[in-house]
Amino acid sequence: MARGPRYKVPKRRRREGKTNYYKRYKMVLSGHPRFVVRKTLKHIIVQIVTAKPEGDITIAAAHSRELYKKYGWMGGLGNTPAAYLTGLLAALRGLKAGIKYAVPDIGLHVPTRGAKVFAAIKAANDVGLKVPVGEEVVPSDDRIRGEHIASWAKMLQEASPEAYERFFSKYISRGFDPTQLPTHFEEVKNRILEEYKDVLGE
């Protein structure tokens, strides 16, 4: 509802909580591609996008569903390890397309210390695609590997098997032991790096 004669109705996408136009304007002015990280309730989506007068052009992209379908990932598709692996995949595709630098775009996500969006950005930097980010907000290596998930699973196995089966039903249905997530993370990460070893010059 309007609040007076000088009230200005926000743009539709701002009203819907989809776009911060001021931040977008600043990123477009930089002249660099954007490393776009978005999370839904179940998935992580990462894109490298460049702005053109006719609209945004996606240079490279990755969806966490690919981790399960193509690389055998048995963990959750919306957690911190999945965010890192999805960011890794998008970054490698960006490098293959010739992108060396991008500005971070986390949309309207609140920049919380250790957030999943920063795990994806860390992955890009780890393989040589420069995306500025403060070290203080990046999740720890233990968290990126899923050590916290494995520890919680082990605790539930011993303290409450019923709760364990409820919380980790997806893992169990795939025949995967969540306490082995850190080891599994390294295996899937290496599969992705092996596929793009030509990009990394290995």
Swiss-Prot record:
Keywords: Ribonucleoprotein, Ribosomal protein, RNA-binding, rRNA-binding. The gene is rpl18. This is Large ribosomal subunit protein uL18. The keyword Secreted does not apply. This is one of the proteins that bind and probably mediate the attachment of the 5S RNA into the large ribosomal subunit, where it forms part of the central protuberance. It comes from Staphylothermus marinus (strain ATCC 43588 / DSM 3639 / JCM 9404 / F1). One of its GO terms (biological process) is ribosomal large subunit assembly. Belongs to the universal ribosomal protein uL18 family. InterPro entries: Rbsml_uL18_euk (IPR005485). GO terms for molecular function: 5S rRNA binding; structural constituent of ribosome.
